[in-house]
Amino acid sequence: VCQPHKNRLMLMLKGSLQLGLLPQLHLNFDLMPVDFLARFIAFHSAGFNADSCVFNLHNPQPLSWEQYLDAFSRAGYCFERVSVAQWQQALRAVSLDNALFGVLGFYLDRLDKDIGDTTRILHDNARRGVQNMGEQYPEKDQALLNKGCNYLKTIGFL
């Protein structure tokens, strides 16, 4: 379950929205609905297969960072997309009340491993597990992105 106030990427997103500047990143972004995860876990907890008992529950459906940011733009958030260098320069002036303040060390000089390319994640067991359920990975479509934006707004994170 997403706990955005404890998640570096979510704090980076919120703090960047507070700054009005978001970095242009060329990577894919992961997003998996919790109801799908719950069904997956419930289905596979009933049995054990030593050859495929570890699942990397990553959703390989494509979603670029830019598409993710588009959802926040459509939700009414105003921000400028800037180069990573411009964004990192702006981080040097972040104040104590910005959500990024506590995680600045991860972003000032480089982007740490929590912003990685999801295309490198091995998910063969999970893919087979989804097929065994007779399901497909959820599409990372506008409806799912809107739901995520609304959730962050509803819980008072954004």
What residues fall within each predicted segment?
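NAD(P)-dependent short-chain dehydrogenase/reductase
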Residues: V1-D30, V34-R39, F43, F72
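Glycine- and acidic
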Residues: G20-D30, A50-N56, R127-Y137
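A hydrophobic C-terminal alpha-helical subdomain
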Residues: L22-Q24, Q88-M133
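Short aromatic/basic micro-patch
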Residues: L31, P62, R120
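Two-component system phosphotransfer/interaction surface
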Residues: D35-A46, N146-K153
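Mid/C-terminal beta-alpha module of Rossmann-like enzyme folds, strongest
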Residues: H44-R110, L152-G156
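Amphipathic terminal alpha-helices
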Residues: R120-L158
